Amino acid sequence: MVKLSIVLTPQFLSHDQSQFTKELQQHVKSVTCPCEYLRKVINSLAVYRHRETDFGVGVRDHPGQHGKTPSPQKLDNLIIIIIGFLRRYTFNILFCTSCLCVSFLKTIFWSRNGHDGSMDVQQRAWRSNRSRQKGLRSICMHTKKRVSSFRGNKIGLKDVITLRRHVETKVRAKIRKRKVTTKINRHDKINGKRKTARKQKMFQRAQELRRRAEDYHKCKIPPSARKPLCNWVRMAAAEHRHSSGLPYWLYLTAETLKNRMGRQPPPPTQQHSITDNSLSLKTPPECLLTPLPPSVDDNIKECPLAPLPPSPLPPSVDDNLKECLFVPLPPSPLPPSVDDNLKECLFVPLPPSPLPPSVDDNLKTPPLATQEAEVEKPPKPKRWRVDEVEQSPKPKRQREAEAQQLPKPKRRRLSKLRTRHCTQAWAIRINP
């Protein structure tokens, strides 16, 4: 058991007893070493009434006081004991105090190396993650991105965990950005509906520029072709190099479209004139004004607006020329016969020519070559078929009494019918 002698100086005796006890208690509580006995002694100083105790504290009686107070010598001894105790545990006290101060400062001042919302730290971490390869990967709780930890780049707990206020700020900003984006996308559709006239005008201008860019990339027309002074007019006859009958038929052409136009169709021939009187164009009507591939034969490119009529053809046997039937044909050279001076008129159809049995038997107008052959050679009597003979209609079945009253039809011979028909036909031909 440790015995302590406390000496109270006159300086402490001058203070109030309760105040003195409180000061000693606060001073002893700041010490972190086990000294319960010393605390009990200090707490019992206020109520200590015995003389000559183990502490050796001498108390003098003062008249007029209810209690007894220790002597100044004993108070001085008590202070000396306390000072000696504090000197012995000075290092422990300083160490504990420094630890408490450091922990307190760490809670106040946050780490500068952590993701505390500074963009330089985030950019540095993201740049190192992209530029360098290999390393352990972890996900940052603040940026929600992968962060690589390389040699020399140590990532601690302070670099990952962030303050709650920064996280809340980031979340609020993200929600606001999402709302704004959704709102803009809802009104930025192709229909062009805007809340204000300024936004509507901007949208229309953007649409116009977009369409112009699409047309430019599709057509790829050089800048000179877009000038209005480059278009000029030329004549169709000079361009096609043939007489079309309409030399002043206009064509709209452009000088810059020389390498863009296609090959022009050749002049119309006999076959083209027979089949179609108009100039057949390979270019569809919707592409007449658009540039076509370059042509080899013609350096002057044209864009026809209307088809050309056919050009006149050389005389031929197969011409489908329409002749007036009122004009008689010139006499053809025939052997001396009775029909030298006969003139033929095409008003009346000729009898059928001797042809093999076919579908063309009933033709009333034979071709020109057949007519000439008939004129040169005298017609031979044709053997009529039984089917071709004009048969009288069969009499209706009548009663016997009525049949006796009517005369019976006479039967005619085939030779008489044939001779009579030929005579009538040649009579019509000779005597027009």
UniProtKB/Swiss-Prot annotation:
Q: Which regions are flagged for Basic residues bias?
A: 408-420
Any Pfam family hit? NPIP
Query: Which regions are flagged for Basic and acidic residues bias?
Result: 374-402
Which parts of the sequence are annotated with region: Disordered?
Answer: 260-280, 353-420
Composition bias (Polar residues) maps to 270-280
Highest taxon, organism lineage: Eukaryota
The regions listed as transmembrane in this protein's record are: none
From the UniProt annotation, give the residues forming the signal peptide: none
The UniProt similarity line reads: Belongs to the NPIP family.
Q: What is this protein called?
A: Nuclear pore complex-interacting protein family member B9
Q: Which organism is it from?
A: Homo sapiens
